[in-house]
Amino acid sequence: MSPDAIRVVVCGDDAVGKSSLITSLIKETIIEPQTNNVLPPITISRNDYIESSQEYLNDQDHHHHHQSSPSTMKNKRKHNNKRERERERESSINNVQPNEISEYIPNITTIIDTSSSDMTNLQKELKRADVIWLVYSDHYTYERISLHWMPLFRSMGVNLPIILCANKSDLFPKSKSNLKSTNSDEFVPLINEFKEIEAGVRCSAKNNYNVVEAFYLCQRAVTHPISPIFDAKEGNLKPGAIKPLKRIFWLSDTDQDGYLNFEELSELHKKCFGIEASKSDYEEIVNLIDQKILPSYNTTIETQTPPQQQHLATSAGTPNGTTTTTSKGISEDGFILLNKIYAESGRHETVWCILRAYHYTNSLSLSDKFLYPRLDVNPHSSVELSPTGYKFFVDLFIKFDKDNDGGLNEDELNTLFRSTPGIPKLWVESNFPSSIVCNEEGYVTLQGWLAQWNLTTFLSYKTTLEYLAYLGFDEGNSTKALKVTKPRKIRQKNGKTYRNAVNDRNVFNCFIVGAPKAGKSSLLESFLHGSYSDIYSPTIQPRLVVKDIELRGGKQCYLILEELGELEPAILENKSRLDQCDVICYAYDSSDPESFQYLVELREKHGHLLDEVPAVFVALKADLDKQQQRCDVQPENYTRDLFLNSPLHVSLAWNSSLHEMFIQLVDAAKTPSSATPGIELEVSVDQDDIKHIIMTGAAIAVVGLVSIWVLNSLRR
């Protein structure tokens, strides 16, 4: 992962060699610029830089006798004290694999030369910069780093990564040990004092020494910044980095035993670095953690690890301090420690490779493209779970039903949603789990679990996509878990508008309207649980329930029932909400003579919108004495005038009548022409039916003609 372009602004006092470093990088030989002559901006493309970078890294491997393992997650270096860690941090590029370098390089890198005497231009360039290459060359210019340059950057509000460059190293003694000591003595105080400084490197523009490394470190400071993930002063990973790493561990721990075994770590390694980890890789990682937590008596360390921290190691310690691998694997704390080792030793590319494999950005938040991938949905289409989506949520349910009781209790749900921001807001608004089928203990059943996700996908497919990402959907693009139905077509007949039949949908939405005390809430309860309460409680806020039902022929679908509550008038005036509704259930109390008049007045007020939505009239409480309705027209006559079926008499005590009502609601939603007010059945034949009739007639005619021809042939 790399940005399209970055700007490197080279700063420092006059005569420290800023322009010489740039020319040495470009020409691989020093060209003495004229005094106070600032170079024009230099643009380096990705392709220009890859080859030279690979050659540089290969040379570094040769000179340092360093053989990197193919396993990116491995780190063979031991850090015995803080100074050594800082030295390793300075030369960490030696651990970068040549075949990985291209991943770090932006498409275009622009290098901007500056002059300390032209403060106006310097400030302008700093505000456009992505990283600062800060150069000094002697003790005086070194002191001005903390006395002048860093205060200047902070006073300007510039919060950019800074790479320190000690130029003109050819003027220092040739001793390698003395050079390393000088590096540590110079860089460590500045790195500890100023969090903006990410690394320091000693260079020589004259000898072309470490110039490419310094330039690479500038790029790396942008593509793989250390500051978001590691606190150099505290020597620990930052909380903002620990949180996503814990989520990655949780997703990788497929058996949910709290440890990464060899198979799980190998899969994590393959996802992050493209190759599976070998058994020796795994053992070396475990040993690396063990040596950090439970060092042997032969290992030189700063402080002995307290016994209470030994659980971080995934291996058992032997009496003499050596460690052996157990079958459990790497714990969560051990995984965090492993990444801390990488970060503090300058291997933060490895940490970023892990984070970015799981779609984290530089701000350590999940990428919007990952959370909300593009899905083209026609305004007249709906979105449902695909077979892949069903399988994912079924597997997720089984995985977290730890006690195998067929239900997810509160603890199991909390564990399941650990890698997410929590239960979706939409679920809270729909009073989950009261919106679905639960078992006697109130635990979420698989039936209810799938129904809730169908409800979520129907109402807000973006929420489903978001949570698929959070929950670790790993079948490529999360849109594979969803399917978009065909757009709903609108037809007209005799000036009346109605919806065309649908045959590719499995989720249908039904509004239930009716007078207070008509039995709407009890109907929802019976739909879910097969029982209801006699205690009346008015519905204030809209209420949703969802459940799968079996249709004629054995096919199953999901039916969403929505009681609108006090928002009923507003919702029925909202065309976009009505477009989401597949059928309206007009319910009245057949034992209350005033109940049906409410529906008549409701349709008179909102009829211009309601007439386009399929309708089913239902007479509830049919087990009680039927009463003559006190309105101008009786229910049977009213529905006949609308060319609708007579009200279906339903009692919550009669399960068969309830099931028949739900089937009729789905039938009306699937074949709107049969239940749209004002549409006569005989004039609303579907286009597909006409085609079938024509084709059948044509087939009969062909058969007849063939029969006559055969008969005539026989007579001859």
Swiss-Prot record:
Top-tier EC class: hydrolase
Coiled coil spans: none
Membrane topology reported for the UniProt record: Single-pass type IV membrane protein
Residues reported in the UniProt entry to bind Ca(2+) 2: 401, 403, 405, 412
UniProt GO cellular component terms: ERMES complex; mitochondrial outer membrane
Sequence ranges assigned to domain EF-hand in this UniProt record: 240-275, 388-423
A Pfam family recorded for this sequence: EF_assoc_1
Cell compartments where the protein resides: Mitochondrion outer membrane
Parts of the chain on the Cytoplasmic side: 1-692
Enzyme Commission (EC) number: 3.6.5.-
Membrane-traversing stretches: 693-713
Domain Miro: 3-224, 505-671
Binding-site positions, Ca(2+) 1: 253, 255, 257, 259, 264
GO MF: calcium ion binding; GTP binding; GTPase activity
Keywords assigned by UniProt, alphabetized: Calcium, GTP-binding, Hydrolase, Membrane, Metal-binding, Mitochondrion, Mitochondrion outer membrane, Nucleotide-binding, Repeat, Transmembrane, Transmembrane helix
Binding of GTP 1, residues: 84-91, 113-115, 167-170
Region span, Disordered: 58-99, 303-327
UniProt KW Hydrolase keyword: yes
GO biological process, one term: mitochondrion organization
Binding site for GTP 2: 514-521, 550-554, 620-623
Family as reported in the entry's similarity comment: Belongs to the mitochondrial Rho GTPase family.
PANTHER family: EF-HAND CALCIUM-BINDING DOMAIN-CONTAINING PROTEIN 7 (PTHR46819:SF1)
Biological role stated in the UniProt entry: Mitochondrial GTPase involved in mitochondrial trafficking. Probably involved in control of anterograde transport of mitochondria and their subcellular distribution.
Name this polypeptide is given: Mitochondrial Rho GTPase 1
Name of encoding gene: GEM1
